[in-house]
Amino acid sequence: MNPLKKKAPAKVSASKQKRKNREELNAEGRARKREKKHRGNPPGNRNQEQSGDKHPSGKQQRDPRLGSKVPVPLIVGEQPTKPVVANKVETKPRLSPQEELAMLENDDRLDALLERLENGESLSKEEHAYVDTTLDRIDALMEELGIKLDEEEREEEKQDDIMQLLKGN
């Protein structure tokens, strides 16, 4: 054995440890009691309804006292009844692009708002948004159907005239 390396001292046995006196034991007991006293829920918390903070506000909370709505057979041999199926809500049939375009072009509200704009009156944000969305939809439908505005045709004719002048010179 190397004389430089010494063994670690052995652990002190339980019998040789210093015994605690009555004051120390009482202080530890009071501390344990104080900690134990503050465990659990506050008084009166057993039947409180849960607050809506934890759950999303868009969804209405179900009452936990209400049970299932499934009918229960009262006679042992009776077959269970079939659940009632809710009728499906029919969606409105989609209009063809031609019908939708005709409907938008004959829109009285749009005509009245466009007349107000031509007269120089100002529109509210809602009215302006309605005009913009309706005109955008009309443009999309005209593109889909391959209909071009007269203004575009005139611009194309002007470009053709310019090209002919350039080629002729």
Curated annotation (Swiss-Prot):
An example molecular function term from Gene Ontology annotations: GTPase activator activity
Pfam families reported in the protein's UniProt record: YihI (PF04220)
InterPro entries for the chain: YihI
GO process annotations (BP): ribosome biogenesis
Region: Disordered, residue numbers: 1-83, 150-169
Biased composition (Basic and acidic residues): 21-30, 51-66, 150-161
First and last residue of the signal peptide: none
Record keywords, A-Z: GTPase activation, Ribosome biogenesis
Biased composition (Basic residues): 31-40
Subunit text: Interacts with Der.
Similarity comment: family membership: Belongs to the YihI family.
Function recorded in the entry: A GTPase-activating protein (GAP) that modifies Der/EngA GTPase function. May play a role in ribosome biogenesis.
Alphabetical list of NCBIfam families matching this protein: PRK05244.1-1
Protein name, as recorded: Der GTPase-activating protein YihI
Organism: Photorhabdus laumondii subsp. laumondii (strain DSM 15139 / CIP 105565 / TT01)
